[in-house]
Amino acid sequence: MTSNGSQPQASTPMVSAEEPAAAASVPNSTPMVSAEGPAAAVSAPNSSVVSSAPASAPTASEPVISQVQSLAPIVSGFDPNLHGRLTNEQMRQAQNEAAMQGYEEGSRRNPRLPSSTTAHNDYASMNSNPFETGTAYGGAPRVSFGSYPTFPGSGSASEPNSQRIFPQQHGVNPPAHASDLVPHQATSGGNTGTPFTLGNRAPRNATANTGGMRRRLDSVGLKNIRYEPQAGVVASNQKIRAVGVALIGMGIPEHQLTEVGVYLARHCADVGASDKSALLGTFPGSDITLEEVGTMIKQTEGCTLRQYCAFYAKHVWNLMLQTQSPPANWVGKEFKFETRYAAFDFFFGVESTASLEPADGLIRLPTQAERVANATSKEIQMYRIRSMEGTQAVNFGEVTGGKIGPKPVLSIRK
């Protein structure tokens, strides 16, 4: 109580947001929030200070407390239970602001997308040839990851080379028209030997045999003998190469010799592959007739037309299965519907190891019913041929009896 009768006001220290802990230990005082920090946390009054205050203390500080409480809602997102931590709403708002700032910075740094003209040029550089291996876009590296990948610098994509990967299959033959006819054989480990080559003739003055005929070979020695399958009913690589030289002389491009052979063999599957078969028509887009090519084949290296067609029998088999077109005369040869694809006379070349193997192998093997049907048809054809031939050496009526020959016996009836 002052001399003028007025009651002195209690001192109320101001708590700054920078020093929140300093005001907590001040006795007989009420904390106050500074307006400088709108986001600062306000600590509750000390309970010990409140309990130590006299009961007869004046209530002059009550308006101050109400002002402190009234300031609390002014703080954005104030929650006295968080004690200075951010609320979920404030955290979401901060994350959104950071994401928006990062998006703006990224859009300023990244270059713009290519124009439609550039995209049109990229699509214009696409390779439209469906038979060419490699990637479709011109800007990409020319590597094909299909069944037979090719690599840069490996030559033409339509010709086999050392960089192309082919599956190891039974009866794989090298390209017959290539200069090197040594098939690629995989070797395992470092146990690789020198391939077997005979060389020129040895001197004939050898007087002793030291057991060269009885020398036993191990697996490495056997692997060095790279044998090329040969069959008398299938044209050899030497004959195929000679035929190729003759066809090139006729004006057929070298890179289309295989296509010409497959097309001719497919035609012979319809009309027959004997020397008496009449070949009809011309090759697509050309004035070269099939009869010309067939005659050239018969006149080269003693190769028959059936041997030449049997060399491409596996390709003809795949072609008929892909196009679902069996030989045209399968009904006339009395084949059933289930065995119609075996109704051609060089069917034996489909499973021969001497015939040219397709790059991806056979679509399927012939069934046992197809094998039996083809063998039976072949026996019937031989029976009919023998029926038209006679065995008499003279033409006297007493000998022939007006008959061409004795009645043949069909062997399949025995």
From Swiss-Prot:
Entry's Gene Ontology cellular component terms: helical viral capsid
Pfam families: Flexi_CP
Top-rank taxon, per record: Viruses
GO molecular function: structural molecule activity
Subcellular compartments: Virion
Matching PROSITE patterns: POTEX_CARLAVIRUS_COAT (PS00418)
Key words, A-Z: Capsid protein, Helical capsid protein, Virion
Low complexity bias (residue ranges): 15-27, 38-60
Biased amino acid composition, Polar residues: 1-14, 113-127, 153-166, 185-197
Segments of this protein annotated with the region Disordered: 1-60, 94-127, 148-212
The protein's name in its UniProt record: Capsid protein
Originating species: Apple stem pitting virus (isolate PA66) (ASPV)
Upper lineage: Viruses, Riboviria, Orthornavirae, Kitrinoviricota, Alsuviricetes
